[in-house]
Swiss-Prot record:
Modified residues (Leucine amide): 25
Record's protein name: Caerin-1.8
Chief location category: secreted
Tissue expression notes: Expressed by the skin dorsal glands.
GO cellular component, one term: extracellular region
Domain-level remarks: Contains two amphipathic alpha helix regions separated by a region of less-defined helicity and greater flexibility.
UniProt keyword annotation of Secreted present: yes
Keywords: Amidation, Amphibian defense peptide, Antibiotic, Antimicrobial, Immunity, Innate immunity, Secreted
Amino acid sequence: GLFKVLGSVAKHLLPHVVPVIAEKL
């Protein structure tokens, strides 16, 4: 249900979020 949707969304967002966080660190 909801967690499955959140999991798929996270998989799509992580590749974009990780580089941004890495740059700030």
